Regions:
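A non-transmembrane, solvent-exposed segment enriched in polar/low-complexity residues
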Residues: 6-151
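Amphipathic alpha-helical repeat scaffolds of TPR domains
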Residues: 159-172
Length: 176
């Protein structure tokens, strides 16, 4: 009797780089310090591709070699990963695998709340004490929602590398 495993350890990164230039180099590195180069890809007609195998899920980052702030963090795991690299300030995106979809969902939520925070904090119109207090309560509420979003994602993923990454890298604020 012979058994074969249907679980593949192959990954494919399908990269989309419509804002980047033909011939640009994309670096794929381990996210930890010091960063370790795992591979490179060349942008051709707005796309790039990287394939390989991995027996563990790794937290990585892809970035444009000439502009490191054009980057995307992602989990390198078996399957097809879609990576959209965009020039700042447009955020890059990742999807395609279960953990990367959850990572992007977390990033989207934090980005939405962060945009609200910035909008509130940058409003310079004079206001009375009650309006000011209300604004501060809204800012505090957004901070708490952001923290809860991160902590809930960590709890839902406690048994996998996404949850472990959040646990190791996120320090929850101490609210009054």
């Amino acid at each position: 009797m012979m058994f074969c495993s249907c679980q593949s350890d192959r990954y494919q990164i399908d990269g989309f780089a419509r804002q980047l230039e033909q011939g640009d180099t994309i670096c794929i590195v381990l996210e930890n310090e010091p960063e370790r180069l795992l591979g490179t890809a060349i942008v051709h007609q707005g796309k790039f591709s990287v394939t390989g195998t991995t027996d563990t899920i790794l937290f990585c980052r892809a970035y444009l070699s000439r502009m490191k702030d054009c980057n995307a963090s992602f989990l390198l795991e078996p399957g097809t990963i879609a990576l959209e690299l965009n020039l700042p300030p447009k955020p890059s995106r990742v999807s395609g695998t279960r953990l990367n979809n959850q990572w992007q969902q977390l990033n989207d939520s934090i980005q939405r709340m962060g945009t609200e925070l910035i909008k509130l904090a940058s409003t310079k119109t004079p206001c009375d004490e009650a309006t000011h207090r209300s604004k501060l309560q809204t800012i505090d509420s957004l901070h708490r929602r952001m923290s809860a979003c991160i902590e809930n994602t960590a709890k839902r993923n406690a048994d996998n590398p996404l949850g472990q990454y959040i646990k190791e890298n996120y320090k929850a604020p101490e609210f009054e």
